[in-house]
Amino acid sequence: MSIQDFKDVNIITAFITPFKEDGSINFAALPKLIEHLLAHHTQGLLLAGTTAESPTLTHDEELELFAAVQKIVNGRVPLIAGVGTNDTRDSVNFVKEVADFGGFSAGLAIVPYYNKPTQEGLYQHFMTLADASDLPIIIYNIPGRVVTTLETDTMLRLAQHPNIIGVKECTNLDNIAYLVDNKPDDFLIFTGEDGEAFHALSLGADGVISVASHTNGDELFAMVEAIEKSDIKKAAGIQRQFLPKVHALFSVASPAPVKAVLNHQGFDAGPLRLPLVACTDEEARRIIEIVEK
């Protein structure tokens, strides 16, 4: 488990959790979907994140999911486990559990939500997690869901810790540019916004933690490859075609749109767990038409 696991990793899929109609996890649906993703340029998988409907997963379900995916992937790409909560002690226990579990390259720890810590509180929270075990930590900064923002200067303080290896940044391009300019060389920056992948990578970010890679991985990879080859004209052309698909995938509360497309394509993504609900038939028809164009 180290930052080297992410060498040349640009596209990490924020993996959905497939459910059966009774609401239980559909473990039988995992192999087909995972093999599809790996065949279409997914270079890493994030489990039990936002797209996985993690607020509705029990702790035992998350561990079962980790074990099942780990067995299927069998070391072919790095795995990241969602380990963060708004309780530092609980998060520490989860980090230790995943570290002991083995086979995961990092844990994704969200900025604590609801209790609105100060910057110093956030700093101490993440330092405590990083000190708790040898599992590398990637910070998940998403104020749109959390309310609290981990400010860039606090992020850079945390980036000095050898066990805090990166960030999934869902703020803005100004922050990404500032982090790229000021971070340690071995600190990874992933945008968590599919629509900003073109700009973030052009600014020097390392990659994207993506929802759209479930359905449009080839396009995303082609864009990343063009940026790496400094063919900005080609990358921009792909981005112009890619953006409407991203907008469609987030036109209804995620992951309802991506599950609608995957179900249409025969991947048994299944329903969502309340309080999230599936797209209406009309919403699904419109989204599928755009995403598959």
UniProtKB/Swiss-Prot annotation:
Active site annotation, chain numbering: 140, 168
CDD domains attached to this UniProt entry: DHDPS (cd00950)
Cited Pfam families: DHDPS
Superkingdom in the source lineage: Bacteria
UniProt keyword Amino-acid biosynthesis present: yes
Annotated InterPro entries: Aldolase_TIM, DapA, DapA-like, Schiff_base-form_aldolases_AS
Reactions catalysed according to its record: L-aspartate 4-semialdehyde + pyruvate = (2S,4S)-4-hydroxy-2,3,4,5-tetrahydrodipicolinate + H2O + H(+)
Main location, first listed in the record: cytoplasm
SMART domains for this protein: DHDPS
UniProt-listed Enzyme Commission number(s): 4.3.3.7
Residues the record marks as site: Part of a proton relay during catalysis: 50, 114
Keywords: Amino-acid biosynthesis, Cytoplasm, Diaminopimelate biosynthesis, Lyase, Lysine biosynthesis, Schiff base
Matches recorded under PROSITE patterns: DHDPS_2
GO BP annotations, alphabetical order: diaminopimelate biosynthetic process; lysine biosynthetic process via diaminopimelate
Binding site for pyruvate: 51, 209
Pathway per the UniProt entry: Amino-acid biosynthesis; L-lysine biosynthesis via DAP pathway; (S)-tetrahydrodipicolinate from L-aspartate: step 3/4
GO MF terms, alphabetically ordered: 4-hydroxy-tetrahydrodipicolinate synthase activity
Subcellular location: Cytoplasm
GO cellular component, one term: cytosol
Role description: Catalyzes the condensation of (S)-aspartate-beta-semialdehyde [(S)-ASA] and pyruvate to 4-hydroxy-tetrahydrodipicolinate (HTPA).
Protein family: Belongs to the DapA family.
Subunit structure and binding partners: Homotetramer; dimer of dimers.
Name recorded for this polypeptide: 4-hydroxy-tetrahydrodipicolinate synthase
Annotated organism of origin: Streptococcus mutans serotype c (strain ATCC 700610 / UA159)
